[in-house]
């Protein structure tokens, strides 16, 4: 018969995979050391960069909100100035329209007076010419009627 004693030497100890001898705590310690090293070497710089970036973004957002507030203030100020200037322009426009209307009325009245003076002068000239012509016709009629009477009587 064969001796199976060498088989007993190679057989695993009882407990197998879940044996709690010195290797499990050693692996746990190695895991904790690795985790600590990874935290120091990788995660801390990464978290530092993330925090810096977050702070940078927060600062930029704060600056942007300040700029936006200033822009809104300037916009409202410009809108107020624009409405004020628009009212002034409308007032100036009305003033200019009234002034133009008054000047036009004055010119029309002046033109009417000139026309009336010219018309009165023309009518007066016409009346004086009419009187001259009527007087001259009256004289001619008198002279012709005297000639006719003298020719009839003669």
From Swiss-Prot:
GO terms for cellular component: chloroplast thylakoid membrane; proton-transporting ATP synthase complex. It is found in: Plastid, Chloroplast thylakoid membrane. Keywords: ATP synthesis, CF(0), Chloroplast, Hydrogen ion transport, Ion transport, Membrane, Plastid, Thylakoid, Transmembrane, Transmembrane helix, Transport. GO terms for molecular function: proton-transporting ATP synthase activity, rotational mechanism; proton-transporting ATPase activity, rotational mechanism. It comes from the Eukaryota. InterPro entries: ATP_synth_b, ATP_synth_b/b'su_bac/chlpt, ATP_synthase_B_chain. It is a single-pass membrane protein. The chain crosses the membrane at residues 22-42. F-type ATPases have 2 components, F(1) - the catalytic core - and F(0) - the membrane proton channel. F(1) has five subunits: alpha(3), beta(3), gamma(1), delta(1), epsilon(1). F(0) has four main subunits: a(1), b(1), b'(1) and c(10-14). The alpha and beta chains form an alternating ring which encloses part of the gamma chain. F(1) is attached to F(0) by a central stalk formed by the gamma and epsilon chains, while a peripheral stalk is formed by the delta, b and b' chains. PANTHER family: ATP SYNTHASE SUBUNIT B', CHLOROPLASTIC. In plastids the F-type ATPase is also known as CF(1)CF(0). F(1)F(0) ATP synthase produces ATP from ADP in the presence of a proton or sodium gradient. F-type ATPases consist of two structural domains, F(1) containing the extramembraneous catalytic core and F(0) containing the membrane proton channel, linked together by a central stalk and a peripheral stalk. During catalysis, ATP synthesis in the catalytic domain of F(1) is coupled via a rotary mechanism of the central stalk subunits to proton translocation. Belongs to the ATPase B chain family. HAMAP family: ATP_synth_b_bprime (MF_01398), ATP_synth_bprime (MF_01399). This is ATP synthase subunit b', chloroplastic. It comes from Vaucheria litorea. The gene is atpF2.
């Amino acid at each position: 018969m064969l001796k199976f004693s060498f088989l007993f030497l190679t057989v695993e100890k009882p407990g197998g995979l879940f044996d709690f001898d010195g290797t499990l705590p050693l692996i746990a310690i190695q895991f904790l050391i690795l985790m600590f090293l990874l935290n120091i070497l990788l995660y801390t710089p990464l978290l530092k960069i993330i925090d810096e970036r977050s702070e940078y973004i927060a600062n930029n957002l704060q600056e942007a909100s300040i700029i936006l507030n200033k822009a809104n203030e300037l916009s409202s100020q410009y809108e107020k100035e624009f409405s004020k200037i628009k009212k002034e322009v409308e007032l100036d426009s009305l003033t200019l329209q009234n002034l133009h209307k008054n000047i036009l009325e004055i010119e029309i009245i002046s033109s009417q007076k000139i026309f009336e003076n010219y018309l009165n002068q023309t009518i007066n000239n016409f009346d004086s010419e009419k009187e001259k012509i009527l007087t001259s016709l009256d004289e001619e009629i008198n002279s012709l009627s005297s000639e006719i009477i003298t020719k009839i009587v003669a």
